[in-house]
Amino acid sequence: MFVQPQTTETLIAQAVFITALAMMGFIYAGYPALMFALSHIFRRPVRRDDITPRVSVIIAAYNEERDIAAKLKNTLELDYPRDRMEIIVASDCSTDRTDEIVRGFGPKGVTLYRQPERFGKTIAQNRAVNVSSGDILIFSDATTMYEPDAIRKIVRSFADHEVGCVAGQLIYVDASSSAVGKGCSSYWGYEKFLKSCESRMGSLIGVSGCMYAVRRICHARLAGDMIDDFVIATEIHLQGLRTVYEPEAVAVEDTNHRSKDEFRMRVRVIKQTLSALRRYRQALNPFEHKMFAFQMITHKVLRYSIPFLLIAALIASGWASGAVDWLRFAFIGQLALYGVAVVGFVGERLKIKIGPLAIPYYFVLVSAASLVAFLKALYGETYIVWEPIRDAHNVNPSPETAASHDS
């Protein structure tokens, strides 16, 4: 049987598709497998001890009248010596009853720091640090609830003098079983696995902004458009110290239930991370920063290239689908993936549960957010202030409720 030789175009299309697929495979499967192996070969144990340093819990808030009272009650009930813990609410010029509610907790030792103008969360945190007195600074959000022993667990790693920052475990609660919530929970389970591996062998490259602690002497004043979740770990690394993961220090928070809220949040976070990567590009030098640079490049830079790899794979397989059988099937498979995303989008609007289809739906949503964030970064758009996400379904979860939802 005569086999028609492939043209240069089809050979290029196959090469592009295979390269894109291989890169995505490494990003999502190869990197976790590599980190898992390396973390068991080059393990760096953290020395922990039951210490009780003086801590300052700094709670960032903007128009949080619905949740701030519950957050403060939760914080006051934490199992930590009250004379060793101060609580400061950093209000970013709230216009609702947030400040009034916080003042009501004044007799219980809660301090309100109010910004005279709205400068954003990062600036509010910087200024709250200036009026704090703790040796350990613990940063939280108004919608995040801590388990009773969370502070005791998170500070014990500071017995190790090589540790400058500790990230707790954030558990997302999907109370409404929404498609976005299920996808977020699955994604976060994957991220926590990576955190465990990265921490075992060295240092994290990011923390959860609502649950991390840092030595006062290591805290860096960040620019208003920087995202502390990512930048703090880089700052700590540049000081020669580690950021480690403490999974026993648990906080819980409700997931977003609407795709538009999750999309908006992801665009903002990714855009700010891209800006931070550009500002801290010296940390991407593998000759100087070795494994930390490798983690940054793979876990962040390559991860955010996913939408471009998806586009390249789709175009390449579509271009040669008429000439190469296996590319035709690959093209159909990709169309099916995006079809599932459409089903998820429609299902969310119709309040239909889509079960396991939530994962591909969330994958496409986050990939689209990465693309939009890249374009915003390209055009120089910055985020300093933003509106907190409000959802009638979001209620403050208790740690007990969240326990069964940890993914």
Give the role of each language-model region:
Residues 1-51, 199:
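N-terminal membrane-anchoring/stem segments of glycan-assembly enzymes
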Residues 37, 42, 49, 253, ...:
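Membrane-embedded multi-pass helical conduit in multi-pass membrane proteins
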Residues 73-84:
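Short, acidic, metal-binding catalytic loop of nucleotide-sugar glycosyltransferases
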Residues 81, 91-100, 117, 144:
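A conserved acidic beta->alpha catalytic loop
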Residues 85-88, 99-131, 182, 188, ...:
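Conserved donor nucleotide-binding strand/loop of the catalytic core
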Residues 107, 158-191, 224, 228, ...:
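Catalytic donor/gating beta->alpha subdomain of glycosyltransferases that bind UDP-sugars
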Residues 122-124, 130, 148-226, 358, ...:
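Long helical/loop segments within the catalytic core of UDP-sugar-dependent glycosyltransferases
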Residues 137:
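Short aromatic/hydrophobic "clamp" motif used to bind/position activated sugar donors
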